[in-house]
């Protein structure tokens, strides 16, 4: 792999267009753990809401991935790929924030995640 020149990087950036979007979490989830864990992952809700985002002119969505999701590595990656496929279908460029664990000091991967952040 070669390093791009400043001109190559600038050219690539100019081809991307203006990014318009938001932080994304489906309405059926309380946090990023619920978005991707097995019991609460809902691709139908995700698809509907990504379609709505595209419909109002968004072209990017930022998604946070909690480090606890890697406990279900293989299954998590399947669900994550489903999410990426959905983004691709609607021409949404996801911005992925890796290993975000700052939302709650004692996170768990169970269905009792509905803690209020204090």
Identify the function of each model-found stretch.
Residues 1-118:
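Active-site mouth of glycoside hydrolases
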